[in-house]
Amino acid sequence: MLSVAARSGPFAPVLSATSRGVAGALRPLVQAAVPATSEPPVLDLKRPFLSRESLSGQAVRRPLVASVGLNVPASVCYSHTDVKVPDFCDYRRPEVLDSTKSSRESSEARKSFSYMVTAVTTVGVAYAAKNAVTQFVSSMSASADVLAMAKIEVKLSDIPEGKNMAFKWRGKPLFVRHRTQKEIEQEAAVELSQLRDPQHDLDRVKKPEWVILIGVCTHLGCVPIANAGDFGGYYCPCHGSHYDASGRIRLGPAPLNLEVPTYEFTSDDMVVVG
């Protein structure tokens, strides 16, 4: 306050700074000036001895506040009576509420309880994480209707010799052809040098009399017509691709042979595709 009053300029005549001492443990803001003297201080023997009772009599009886203004003294509050001391009894265990009792007697029980809670929590979190991962992985797998269409069984006795039967498998047409002996000998005699996509007939079949193909043209994905074309196999009317009875491209814009799916003969009269 003294520095404020000194720098106030024209308001200095109306400003005043006062320092009041309040009993407490803190130091005052402004130190009182002590006159310089060479004489030793004289003890006042008549001053009463400051005991606990005399100090309590000098203690502050009411709350102190700090105020600053014009032409008023400034005071500082060194005591806060509205501050509550924190009490953590609600967070402490009953075994350690008594401060006069040693906590070593109950340390084993408290540690065992903490370990048990930690173990149960870890198991629960691991189980929940396992379920979450399982559901996430299963959501990326194929649905039940797709799995049902993943494989198809074809009864071969329903397909007469020299005929081709079409099925729907995984959203695509599936051709199952029962070839005659003449077609088998004709396709086996084709030289690989004459083929755009060289592949021997025996490499495309497991049984010479049965040809199983995916009926999708390798040009632009059209569906060829069976028992048609210049080579008596399959013909795509969209752009004029000709395939033989083994599904090999012989003429037209298609670059590759018809695809052969994975299949297995479970018996002489049954084949499983997929």
UniProtKB/Swiss-Prot annotation:
Keywords: 2Fe-2S, Disulfide bond, Electron transport, Iron, Iron-sulfur, Membrane, Metal-binding, Mitochondrion, Mitochondrion inner membrane, Respiratory chain, Transit peptide, Translocase, Transmembrane, Transmembrane helix, Transport
Top class in the EC scheme: translocase
Binding-site list for [2Fe-2S] cluster: 217, 219, 236, 239, 241
Regions that span the bilayer: 104-140
Annotated compartments: Mitochondrion inner membrane
Mitochondrial intermembrane side: 141-274
Chief place where the protein resides: mitochondrion
Cofactor notes: Binds 1 [2Fe-2S] cluster per subunit. Fe-S cluster delivery to the Rieske protein is mediated by components of the iron sulfur (Fe-S) cluster assembly machinery that reside in the mitochondrial matrix (including HSC20 and LYRM7).
Catalysed reactions, as listed in the record: a quinol + 2 Fe(III)-[cytochrome c](out) = a quinone + 2 Fe(II)-[cytochrome c](out) + 2 H(+)(out)
GO cellular-component term (any): mitochondrial inner membrane
GO molecular function: 2 iron, 2 sulfur cluster binding; metal ion binding; ubiquinol-cytochrome-c reductase activity
InterPro entries recorded: bc1_Rieske_TM_sf, Globular_prot_asu/bsu, Rieske_2Fe-2S, Rieske_2Fe-2S_sf, Rieske_Fe-S_prot, Rieske_Fe-S_prot_C, Rieske_TM, Ubiquinol_cyt_c_Rdtase_Fe-S-su
Domain Rieske: 187-272
CC cofactor: [2Fe-2S] cluster
Misc remark: The Rieske protein is a high potential 2Fe-2S protein.
Family: Belongs to the Rieske iron-sulfur protein family.
Protein name: Cytochrome b-c1 complex subunit Rieske, mitochondrial
Species this protein is from: Colobus polykomos
Gene symbol of the encoding locus: UQCRFS1
